[in-house]
Amino acid sequence: MEYTLIIILILILGLLFTKRLNYKSKKANQLIVYNSTVLDVRSVLEFNRGHFKNSINIPLDLLSKNIDILKKESKPVVVVCSHGIRAASACTILKKNQIDCINGGSWNNLK
């Protein structure tokens, strides 16, 4: 009985998390439609294998050194990477520098 409750709880939490990710992707797509800057924080090699059209590539480890590039942008920034983890870290850096951004998750979600 206890295992059944635990499994049900895990399933419910999984569904809630998935809906939250879908919401973030939809919000990111809406921002792109309204003329935002797409920042891809994957490595140059990953970026060259495929990327969202017109996105800017600044790898996460170089972001702090290149923050001025994004400060010149007047548009919100949608940050993407391969799975959303590096994008979340990048958003933290951008927000500390007063740059409006959203974690767009995987760049594949924006296609």
What name fits each language-model region?
Residues 1-49:
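Flexible, polar/low-complexity N-terminal or interdomain linker segments that lie immediately upstream
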Residues 32-37, 53-54, 75-77:
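Short active-site oxyanion
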Residues 47-53, 94:
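Short loop/helix-cap segments at secondary-structure boundaries that form the rim of catalytic
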Residues 71-109:
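Catalytic cysteine-centered active loop of the rhodanese-like fold, especially the PTP/DSP P-loop
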